[in-house]
Amino acid sequence: MQSIVDAIEKGELDAEIKLVLADVKDAYILERARRHGLPAQWLDCAPWKTKLEGPAEDRCIELLKAAGCDTVVLAGFMRIVKPKLLAAFPMRVLNIHPALLPAFPGVHSWTQALDYGCKVAGVTVHFVDAGTDSGPIIVQKAVPVLEDDTPETLHARIQVQEHLAFPEALRHLAAGRLRIEGRRVRIG
């Protein structure tokens, strides 16, 4: 989130953060949001550990709509979102994933890239669909996989690119430059 806030504050991204929600009660993102004067709230997702559904999904949609949100950015939100949220914000839910999708969806993708002997890894910003990390791709940034990389060193390099990729994708979206054709997102 910090890279998005920074891009807005520098005038590099014409957007407004209307609400920050976190599914972890003491998540650092809530404190970070408050330091920037952004409305922030914890969203109780119990009893589900990996999904956003039921009353929590209803509450999430209610809060986002009440705040006037038209786009939902999933940054560090490690839950599977369901069709109800996607229908409330059609093709306006974006996620960032630390892999060059469609390779290595799900968790620990940088470790998977090392295990498979990949020569490049990276990050993908994509629209969220009903699958897991399977929506149309907006932006990708690649990093080399070095011979002496560990999961930690590779992940750190990927995170640098994450901080560039999300603001870039949001700039395209805010400027109306994204056109979805099937699985392809054209930027024009």
Task: Label each PLM-derived region with a short phrase.
Residues 1-188:
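One-carbon transfer enzymes
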